Amino acid sequence: MNIKRVFFDIDDTILQNNDNSTISTDLIKRISEMQEKGIKVHLATGRGYVSTVPVAKALGIKDELILYNGAVVVDVNGNILLNNLVDKKVYRELIKISREENVHLNLYYNDTIYVEKYDEHIKDYMSKTLQGLIIRDFDDYDNEFSIKCLFIDETDVLDELKKKIESRISNIYIVRSTPNYLEVLNEKANKVNGVKFVLNKYGVDKNEAMAFGDQNNDYDMLKYVGHGYIMGNAKQELKDLFDENKIAGHTKEQGVLNKINEVIFGI
């Protein structure tokens, strides 16, 4: 099978529980062998650059990184190749909605997270990221853009919040990256658009690409490439959208590694 590019989601796909220490040494070895065969490997994640680089280095990845769910594409040195950002008019309306509904909101600018208050939501979030944090009244946040806007709360709260956002703001991309994270991005910011950018840059057909992911924000990417695999630990309603042969094993059971062994190495 002629696979030329492989795209990995990070959390709960190649990592367990957002823990960098759970990277499989067997997967590291396989990635090296794939690269020796001329296959290029990329990460496609909701993470920012500073939280993605340690994973890329551990895996030996030297090619483009798709960050912030496709809002930004960089080379491995952090040089920006593509960005699609949330403009001021949109993020100011999101701030209003956050205050009206009393739902926690993160804004992102240059690998720094901005919040209005330090609460349990951001305490938990910061335990999983290497990004910087600034606590500031959002009335004083006057940057020209936010890379993305992230609401954190219970699933049912975010379900209702999504409806309210969609009723008031158009031309945006809204996606769940976890059951408790609702992300609002530029309408062109999507992992699949990051994948398309990389494939077009090198003249690679989508049928020569493979991808792995576990959440709603991975769906379009997995359906676009010729070889897209949803993880066995994904929620059932998402797995139901894929043929059985497009479901990889659970991340705790080396699901990515086993599927690579099967599809690329014929093991």
Language-model regions: role of each:
Residues N20-I39, N83-V90, G132-L133, A189-N200, ...:
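Short, acidic loop-to-helix structural element flanking the phosphoryl-transfer center
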Residues G60-K62, L82-L85, I122-M126, K191-N193, ...:
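Short, hinge-like loop/turn segments at secondary-structure boundaries
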